[in-house]
């Protein structure tokens, strides 16, 4: 038969189990607004039945339950939902970075008002047209000089501003690399702590939450693959183990392991820059250098690399800002060369041969390099307030032929970057391509943000604390606790009857 005190022990176990459930519920409520917290529950299981199976087991009507015990405190989390969230978070990090970089470029070019380069070029063209109609007007020549100076200064401003934004992108790129390394270091520390807790049969849920939050942040910067390494000892089956993390390329192939969860090692990232151009040449993962053009791991880091600029294995400069700066440099160079050639063939009002209207200094091997930032109107034109403008071909007072040719430089065909086009059309093409690219980046950023929010909602429905649900659970566990307490009282009354109310005859 069962022990006299078996019912008391069964009730005690019930009290202990329901108390653990209530404590877990209280912890859920307390952390309802804690970032990264995953709701928890006590996994309850029935204790062994009595009597145990054996040849000498006591003959009873059947095995009797002996109560309940808390097996573990587990998180309510779905690894597939984590994967979906991090996948969208990765895309969002990449497209958001590209969209912001393109938006900053649009802000610099400023083609929505009258201060943009297109408007300034048109004003310059109009001043040349006015000069061709009024060759004897000193004011017309002075206006051409000022408008030409405005063109040069606008080129200078755009080049300088784009270079400044590019420098800011480099700083953000370096900060992102530091952030990645910091997250990896923190994850490695958590791995070590988890490896100490799990083998003794406990689940470090708080450490799991911290780790998942850090992995979420890391996923926005680089594309990662997370794998789990089971702990030894007496680890529970539900123990997650330590994590190892690999960086993936666009084809989901590994570029290298950055966190080794078995050996607790971190391979830090480093951005390497080309000495000549200053652009990204490679990304180091530990001791392995990956060429910048081959580093295709999506995320904000790649967004910064593609925006700031990188150099290919054959020396080509690629990226949003280097390519725009190169296009503007080539445009400024070819425009100035064509304009100067026409101006040199003309004659000033005083009958002197025209010289260069624009001055610029380029490199010997790459004359276009930095041309947009260096172009200026020749000092002779500025100092004479336009008197030295060669508007004529013959020197005759009413000869406006060269002024007309100068105006045609802006609208006529010249070769820029191997294309037969006009200066105005070439720049309009640059702005059009930028607008399309920025619009597409904004669209993708918006779409991925929506998908990220949907993935987050799905995950929150599974893992977030619902106060309504916790209140319901609290009432359920409270009633169970009260019933167990009542069972203790009942057992006490039964024992009192046995001890104090039986066998009193003959006293």
Curated annotation (Swiss-Prot):
Keywords: Bacterial flagellum, Secreted. GO terms for biological process: bacterial-type flagellum assembly. GO terms for cellular component: bacterial-type flagellum hook; extracellular region. The keyword DNA-binding does not apply. It is found in: Secreted; Bacterial flagellum. Signal peptide: none annotated. The keyword Secreted applies. GO terms for molecular function: structural molecule activity. It comes from the Bacteria. Belongs to the flagella basal body rod proteins family. This is Flagellar hook-associated protein 1. It comes from Bacillus subtilis (strain 168). The lineage of its organism: Bacteria, Bacillati, Bacillota, Bacilli, Bacillales.
């Amino acid at each position: 038969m069962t022990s006299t005190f078996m019912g008391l022990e069964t009730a005690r176990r019930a009290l202990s189990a329901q108390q653990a459930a209530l404590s877990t519920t209280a912890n859920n409520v307390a952390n309802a607004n804690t970032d990264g917290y995953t709701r928890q529950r006590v996994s309850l299981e029935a204790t062994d039945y009595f009597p145990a199976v054996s040849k000498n087991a006591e003959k009873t009507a059947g095995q009797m339950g002996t109560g309940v015990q808390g097996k573990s405190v587990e998180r309510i989390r779905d690894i597939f939902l984590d994967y979906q969230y991090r996948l969208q978070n990765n895309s969002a990090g990449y497209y958001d970075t590209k969209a912001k970089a393109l938006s900053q470029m649009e802000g610099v070019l400023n083609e929505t008002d009258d201060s943009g380069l297109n408007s300034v070029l048109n004003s310059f063209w109009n001043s040349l047209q006015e000069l061709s109609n009024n060759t004897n007007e000193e004011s017309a020549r002075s206006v051409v000089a000022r408008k030409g100076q405005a063109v040069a200064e606008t080129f200078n401003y755009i080049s300088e501003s784009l270079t400044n934004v590019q420098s800011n992108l480099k700083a953000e790129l370096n900060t992102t690399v530091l952030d990645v390394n910091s997250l990896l270091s923190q994850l490695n520390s958590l791995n070590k702590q988890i490896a100490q807790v799990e083998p003794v049969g406990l689940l470090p849920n708080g450490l799991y939450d911290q780790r998942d939050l850090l992995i979420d942040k890391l996923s926005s910067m680089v594309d990662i693959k997370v794998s789990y390494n089971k702990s030894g000892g007496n680890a529970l089956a539900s123990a997650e183990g330590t994590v190892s993390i690999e960086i993936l390329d666009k084809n989901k192939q590994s570029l290298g392991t950055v966190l080794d969860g078995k050996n607790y090692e971190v391979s830090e990232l480093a951005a390497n820059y080309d000495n000549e151009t200053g652009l990204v040449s490679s990304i180091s993962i530990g001791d392995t250098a990956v060429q910048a053009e081959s580093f295709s791991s999506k995320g904000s880091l790649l967004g910064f690399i593609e925006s700031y600029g990188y150099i290919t294995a054959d020396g080509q400069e690629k990226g949003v800002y280097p390519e725009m700066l190169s296009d503007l440099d080539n445009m400024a160079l070819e425009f100035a060369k064509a304009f100067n050639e026409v101006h040199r063939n003309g004659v000033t009002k005083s009958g002197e041969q025209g010289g260069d209207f624009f001055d610029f200094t380029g490199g010997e091997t790459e004359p276009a390099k930095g041309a947009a930032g260096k172009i200026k109107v020749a000092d002779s034109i500025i100092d004479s307030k336009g008197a030295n403008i060669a508007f004529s071909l013959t020197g005759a007072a009413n000869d406006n032929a060269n002024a007309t040719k100068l105006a045609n430089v802006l609208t006529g065909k010249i070769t820029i970057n191997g294309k037969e086009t006009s200066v105005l059309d070439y720049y309009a093409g640059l702005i059009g391509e930028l607008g399309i690219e920025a619009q597409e980046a904004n669209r993708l950023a918006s779409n991925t943000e929506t998908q990220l929010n949907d993935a987050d909602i799905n995950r929150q429905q599974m893992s977030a604390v619902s106060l309504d649900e916790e209140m319901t659970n609290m009432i359920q566990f409270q009633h169970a606790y009260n019933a167990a307490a009542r069972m203790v009282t009942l057992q006490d009354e039964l024992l009192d009857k046995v001890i104090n109310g039986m066998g009193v005859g003959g006293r």
